[in-house]
A protein has these predicted regions:
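Conserved N-terminal alpha-helix of the aminotransferase class I/II PLP-enzyme fold
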Residues: 2-39
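Conserved PLP-anchoring active-site segment centered on the Schiff-base-forming lysine
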Residues: 46-65
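Active-site-proximal loop->helix
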Residues: 49, 65-75, 79
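Short, structured coil segments at secondary-structure junctions
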Residues: 53, 74-75, 128, 159
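Conserved Walker B
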Residues: 62, 108, 137-138
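Active-site phosphate-binding strand-loop segment of PLP-dependent enzymes
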Residues: 79-134
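Active-site PLP attachment segment
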Residues: 152-187
Length: 201
């Protein structure tokens, strides 16, 4: 067969998984990467693992359903701002009142096809001490000099804490990934239930 018949946490990690993750991390300009069975699970697994009780997730109203479901699975409070409206985003960040917050946004929005205003989103994230996650599902292979997505397109890879991607669009396959700094990926390996309790890619 073609499956590993086990979780990545147990017997489901092969050399080809590690090689794939290294290549994906290099593509999007991050230290490390974690491959999930699907892009949907990547969003669920990342968001629900890193946002805890008393913390906030701030999302665009047009964000993908997998982002919304990840928020609902977390212990955090979800705040939604009007589509690509920076004043509305800032109001949400003010409402978070200095508590830990994660902004999650599509690089390219799946229904409208427009691009997120990442320069201003990143600036607001920095101003209010929020972390930033960009879903590159529809921008991977489309934006950026190397096709790495919206974060690369705007020169904001270093200021983007988490980059999510899927294999089901430009790459015409099945799977998804989260790329970030090594300590964050190490944390997800041990806390992301969508990874731990699912058979590997």
């Amino acid at each position: 067969g073609s499956g590993c018949a086990g979780s990545r946490f147990l017997n489901g990690t092969l050399d080809i998984h590690i090689e794939l993750e290294e290549k994906l991390a290099d593509l999007v300009g991050k230290e490390a990467c974690l491959a999930y069975p699907t892009g949907y699970q990547a969003n669920l697994g990342c968001i629900s693992a890193i946002v805890g009780r008393g913390e906030y997730i701030v999302i665009d109203k047009y964000d993908h359903a997998s982002i919304i479901d990840g928020c609902l699975l977390s212990d955090g409070t979800m705040l939604r701002y009007n589509h690509n409206d920076m004043k509305s985003l800032e109001k949400c960040l003010i409402r978070a009142d200095g508590k830990p917050a994660l902004i999650v946004v599509d690089g390219i929005f799946s229904m409208e096809g427009d691009i997120a205003n990442l320069p201003e989103i990143s600036e607001l994230a920095e101003r209010y001490g929020a972390n930033l996650m960009v879903d590159e599902a529809h921008s991977l292979g489309v934006l950026g000099k190397r096709g790495a997505g919206a974060a690369e397109h705007f020169g904001l890879t270093e200021k983007t804490d988490f980059i999510m991607g899927t294999f089901s669009k430009t790459l015409a396959s099945v799977g998804g990934f989260i790329a970030a700094d090594e300590p964050l990926i190490h944390y997800l390996k041990h806390k992301s239930r969508a990874l731990i309790f699912s058979a590997s890619l």
